[in-house]
Amino acid sequence: MAKTRVAVLYGGKADEHSISCISAASFMRALDPELFEAVPIGITKTGTWFVDGQDPLGWNLAEGLPEAVETPDSREVVLTIGDGGDGFHARNADGSLDSLGHIDVVLPALHGPFGEDGTIQGLFEMMGVPYVGCGVLASAACMDKHYTKVLLRAAGIPVAPGITLDTRHYDASDEFATDGEEFLRQVNEAGLQYPLFVKPSRAGSSFGVTKVEQIGDAAALAAAVFEASRHDWRVLVEQGIDAREIECAVVRIHPTDPTRAALPGEVVLDRRSEGDDQFYDFDSKYMDSQASHTEIPAKIGDDLIARVRETAVRAFDAVDGMGLSRVDTFVTADGDVLVNEINTLPGCTSISMFPQAWEAMGIPFRTVVTDLIEGALA
């Protein structure tokens, strides 16, 4: 029987480029060689698609963060939209095109903008090529934390209080220094309590997130908004929640299937080898092996475990999720469960919660990946 040919996309234009490369390596290692043939397609930081680059199978976090770059043997990928799965080609040095063969399904191991935000999903919808993961609407809505909260509130699912700023209306020439008082006015008007977390609405892996602790510090707030605006013009200012951050992996293999939730886990901060140790930022996620460890299931008791799983399923269904996601929640000391965000293509590195959560339930990551691909093809 012919193997299913899976185009694994990695890299991309987003800040999470390197994490995408590592996730792609994990996905490729999880592909059952008896069932699937991987066709790795890299995307450079400037957006060029290529084949015949470095082998992603050689990448891992222990050796640092890789980058999808062309090699002397690389060839640019050209898509012919109307040809569907036969529309993947490689451009030769003389300008001629070679077919990459029929692509049965795409596994977009891409995080952040241009990969997790509905844009590439729309491309494959137009091509008529099946792909793993959430569709256009769910991807776009969950990439934008503001609109995620709009949808979740409408579904009656609690979220953290906050405000949204359109920084295009303010003066970035002085890094918003003259706008700090206006930002502070809006924070006070909304009744937000400190500490505040200021974050880009459309970014992942904790890029651009700043914690503001000093009450009434307009300068610190302005600086935090400017840092977030470097990643997205839409910026969220959220009230810090005195809670534990509990993450829950979910899957829905086929539209008629119920959403399934894995055992929730918690990333426990230990210590940072250097820098601020107060929240789980990019460095403590990926660059500092001593910063944290993962506990699955989270040590929150059976009742809260069940409620987190139920909330994660409700949140995923509320945004019409499909395939896979990781739902990040806050669990307060009073037992309240709030949704922080939904990651429609969660990190799948060796230290990431999504693969570990299923493994903790006795379900190998290879089985999950096989199910996701077969579900996309159904």
UniProtKB/Swiss-Prot annotation:
Any one GO cellular component localisation term in the record: cytosol
Record keyword Oxidoreductase present: no
Catalytic reactions on record: 2 D-alanine + ATP = D-alanyl-D-alanine + ADP + phosphate + H(+)
Family the entry assigns: Belongs to the D-alanine--D-alanine ligase family.
Signal sequence bounds: none
Positions bound to Mg(2+) 1: 328, 341
Keywords: ATP-binding, Cell shape, Cell wall biogenesis/degradation, Cytoplasm, Ligase, Magnesium, Manganese, Metal-binding, Nucleotide-binding, Peptidoglycan synthesis
Listed EC numbers: 6.3.2.4
Main localization category: cytoplasm
Protein name: D-alanine--D-alanine ligase
Subcellular localization(s) per the UniProt record: Cytoplasm
Binding-site positions, ATP: 189-247
Broad EC category: ligase
Listed cofactors: Mg(2+); Mn(2+)
Single biological process term from Gene Ontology: cell wall organization
Highest rank taxon of the organism: Bacteria
Note describing how the cofactor binds: Binds 2 magnesium or manganese ions per subunit.
Bilayer-crossing regions: none
Gene3D superfamilies: 3.40.50.20, ATP-grasp fold, A domain (3.30.1490.20), ATP-grasp fold, B domain (3.30.470.20)
Lineage, top ranks: Bacteria, Bacillati, Actinomycetota, Actinomycetes, Bifidobacteriales
Any one GO MF annotation of this record: metal ion binding
